[in-house]
Each structure stands twice: as C-alpha cells, then as structure tokens.
Design a protein with these regions (language model features):
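Short acidic, flexible loop segments centered on an aromatic residue
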Residues: 419-434
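Cysteine-centered iron-sulfur cluster-binding motifs in ferredoxin-type domains/subunits
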Residues: 127-142, 234-249, 278-326
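Terminal connector regions
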Residues: 464-503
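Asparagine-centered strand-capping/turn motif at beta-strand->loop junctions
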Residues: 414-418
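Short aromatic-acidic-glycine turn motif
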Residues: 399, 430-442
Length: 503
C-alpha cells in the first residue's frame, strides 16, 4: 500500500472527518493574527477551487473586465479621414484623448481629473456600503492573480495536487508542469503588456511594428516593464501585493461604519466549534464543524473566523465554501455571510437589525458624486471649441519707438478644436488710442485662418502714441484681446496688460 501524503490523508481519512461525509482540511491560516510577523518569511498559499454564487460572480466579473481590457484597443470608431479611428486612444503625440465620440484635448485635463475624483468617491461609497468589494472582484491585482491561479490549476491540479507537486523531488513531471505554468504566465503577461501599449497608438499598426521590429524603442521598453510587472505581481507576489504594497487596506477602516456590509463569521451561531459525529445532536454546540473549508479557499490565507482582518479582500469565497458544508450537514446557510458590524457585535439571541442604506456617510459620498458629475456636465455643455492664450513679451516688457510711442508685443495662440477650418478676427480694447498690427498681415483686423484640429500662433503688436501715454493707468493698463469667429460670431475674450514706463 502506497503511503499517502499527509495533506491528502487529512482530507480523505475517516479519522479526520469534521462531520459524516465531510473531510476536515488540514490547512493553516497563513495570514492569521497569531502568525502575523513583520519579519516572517512568506508561506505559499494554495487556494482551493470554490463553487457557488460568489465564485460565479467572480468568474463573470473576471471575464468582463479582461474582455474589456484586451478588446477595447481593437474597437474602431469612424471620426473622419484625418483623425484616428481607434475607439479609445490616448494620443500623446497630438495631446488628445479619444473615447468614442468624445475628444478631450490637453487643455481640458480637468475632465480627466473629474473622472478620477468620481472614481475615488465611487470607491469610497462602495466601501462604505459593502466593504472592499472592489478589491475582491474588480481590482486588477485580484483579476490577474485569479487568472494566474486558473492557469496554475489547469497545469498542476487543485490544492492538494499543487502541494504534493511542490513537496516532491524534481522529476520530469514536475519540471514540465512548472515550465508549462510559468510559460503560460509569461504569455499572459506579454499579452497584457502588449495590449497596454496599444492604448497609446493605433493597435493594428503598432502590433505589426512590434512583430517586424519597427516599433519605437519606447514601446518595447514599456511593454517589457508591463510584462515583467504582470508576471511578478500576478503570478509570483499575489497576496503580498495586497498585504504589503497596497495602501487601501489601511485606508478602508476610515470608510466603514456600523452599517457597512462585510463578509463575517457569525460566532454566536458557530461557537463552540468542533467536529460533529454521526448521531450527535446539535444542541449545546455551534454549527461550525471546524472543517476549515473557509480557510482552504481563501486566496489571502486568512481564517475569517478570527474576525475582521486587514488581509481580507471581501471576495466571499469563504461564504460559498461554508454554505456548501452547511448544505451537506443539513444546517441553515449563512454561518459566514455579508452582515453589518452592529449585527456581528450584537449579543447572541438579539434581533438582527435591518440594513440602513440611507445614512450620513452614504449620503455624503453620494452627494459629492452628484455634485462633481453636475459640474462636469455643466463644464461639458459650456465647453468652447476655441482656446485662446495670450503671452506678453517679457524681455523687454515694452519698446520705445523713434516717434516716442510705446509698443508691447504679444504672442496669441489660437486652438481650433473642431474638424473644420475656421477664420477669426482680432480685436483690441481698453486703450484710449492705439495702433495694432499682426506680423504677416496687412491689417490688424485681417481674417486669420486656423486649420482643423490645430494650433496657430501669431505675433501681435500694440502701440500707444505719445499724446495718449498720459492717459494710461500707471505702468500696467488693462488690455482686452478678443477673437471672433467670422462664420458664427463666437467670441473669446482674454485679459492682459499694456506695459509702459513705470512697470
């Protein structure tokens, strides 16, 4: 008879049953409070495959998020013959962001800021309502780690098989399984790094250049960095990123309140825990049979029965594992489940308080999100298709001409954010008497044409004759430059100053 590995024997031997037909898994909570140490070496976690509602939700979220990430750069959007047709493109060369019909210029980065603020507030709101649900389901670290574990499970088997393989000597079987696993991880990491650079240039064009070796060196460098990062963080580091590198577990405590839904162990129902023998009643004991299925499926290596912990990402796989065991032993579901702090901490036998969605913290985050969204909508509706900047000459501030006139120079930049050529006229206001001229034009009010999607800079000179100098306000007189669209009459106004002696 072949001697079994200790781990396999613990799960299959009748002597270690937690209940009739339910094996007690010999698993250690690697990240438990009792074993946590700043200088402790890492103990590898072997999460077991879970089945149930929350695992199905995680499969769905993983498929959707990965699908969006890998496919989005390949989607096309027709913007005309002179513009890129990639649906989402962060075009650094032309300083623009394209997202479907939306086109954001570098001068409009406040929209990106608004999106980031909305995202942060949304994260705060989700945390206040349901804990670290973002971490457990949609965080890129979680999604890619989950994907790497799927690949590892495909080549090496589930928890017991992987543990047995790691403990075995370096045989041919171990070598090819480990090699296949790491090669698969590298291919996933390479695809991830390659797709990421596609967000910054036309995907089909850059893909061909990468294959033929004609892509810019910076594309290969960043692709290599992202490939290495994905392989290291998703395949090797895994839970260490969440525990030690990510600041969010430390911040989240400030986002909770007594009504936040968290994955929790109901100790008043589960204790005292212990194996349940055949024919034994459930009186004077808890429903927890100490099978440790919740620990075995946890990707963070914690024991949820120890209470709320920094390492818990609220993935709820322990709920699926526990519900499966409760079904087998014919006990009510929900020994581990989503519940609020006030219900978890309530004395045994006290009535369960209903969830309050309307509360100050939730209303604050929701109100701020509505406010930011409204401001962004207003800014978008008021968005101008013309951007004007006026840069006065600094050295010198002014020039004294031979006839005694004072002349100031200004560089006027006109940005046409439309896809059609536009013509503008310049106006000057605020001086008692002046002469204006534009370099390269016969008259100051000559039409200035600006090409589509382009910036044109013109040099403007404004001179004040000697008789009018006495009427100027000190050394800096307010001056207004107006740019008017000849076709539709749109006017953009910029204030500056006319410098004279005394400035």
């Amino acid at each position: 008879m072949t001697q079994m590995e200790p781990q396999a024997r613990m799960e299959t031997g009748a002597a270690t049953e937690a209940a009739p037909g339910v094996a007690r898994i010999d698993v250690e909570a690697v990240s438990s409070k009792s074993s946590r140490s700043l200088y402790a070496g890492r103990k590898k976690i072997y999460p077991k495959l879970a089945h149930g509602t929350f695992r199905s939700v995680k499969w769905l979220v993983m498929a959707v998020t990965l699908g969006i990430y890998y496919l989005l750069p390949w989607l096309r959007w027709d913007r005309g013959p002179t513009l890129p047709d990639q649906a989402f493109l962060l075009d650094f060369a032309n300083q623009r962001l394209y997202f479907g019909p939306i086109e954001i210029w570098a001068q409009e980065l406040y929209f990106i800021t608004g999106v980031l603020v909305l995202s942060a507030l949304g994260l705060f709101l989700v945390t206040a309502l349901a804990g670290r649900m973002w971490c457990g389901y949609a965080c890129p670290q979680t999604v890619w780690t989950d994907l790497m574990i799927v690949v590892e499970r495909f080549w090496q088997g589930d928890r017991n098989a992987r543990m047995k393989l790691d403990k075995s000597h370096w045989t041919f079987e171990k070598i090819w399984k480990k090699t296949a696993t790491h090669l698969s991880w590298l291919l996933i990491a390479l695809a991830t790094g390659g797709v990421l650079v596609f967000y910054f240039r036309d995907a089909p064009t850059l893909a061909m250049e990468l294959v033929t070796g004609e892509a810019p060196a910076v594309a290969y460098v960043f692709m290599g960095i992202f490939t290495f990062s994905t392989y290291l963080l998703g395949g090797i580091a895994r839970e260490q990123v969440c525990i030690y590198m990510c600041p969010w577990p430390r911040i989240q405590a400030a986002m909770y309140d007594q009504d936040s839904l968290l994955v929790s162990y109901h100790g008043h129902r589960g204790e005292p825990r212990g194996p349940h023998k055949k024919g034994q009643t459930w009186e004077d004991r808890g429903d927890c049979i100490d099978c440790k299925a919740c620990v075995a499926v946890c990707p963070m290596g914690i024991d949820i029965r120890d209470g709320q912990q920094l390492e818990c990402i609220q993935c709820a796989l322990c709920i699926d594992a526990c519900d499966d065991i409760m079904t087998k032993v014919d006990r009510p579901l929900g020994l581990i489940g989503y519940d609020t702090f006030q219900n978890i901490e309530a004395p045994a036998g006290s009535p369960r308080k209903p969830l309050r969605l309307v509360r100050p913290r939730v209303m604050l985050y929701s109100g701020l999100m509505v406010l930011v969204a409204a401001l962004m909508l207003w800014a978008w509706m008021m968005r101008s298709t013309i951007e004007i900047s006026v840069i006065p000459d600094r050295n010198p501030l002014f020039v004294v001409l031979s006839d005694g006139s004072i002349r100031n120079g200004y560089t006027l930049k006109i940005l046409n954010k439309t896809h059609d050529e536009r013509t503008f006229r310049l106006g000057v206001e605020g001086l008692p008497a002046f002469q204006a001229s534009i370099v390269g034009f016969d008259q100051a009010d000559a039409p200035v044409a600006v090409e589509p999607d382009s910036l044109r800079a013109i040099k403007v000179y404004v001179s004040v004759p000697p008789p009018a100098l006495a009427k100027l306000a000190g050394g800096a007189t307010p001056l207004t430059l107006t740019v008017t669209d000849v076709e539709n009459g749109d006017v953009v106004i910029r204030d500056t100053a006319f410098r004279s002696p005394g400035s």
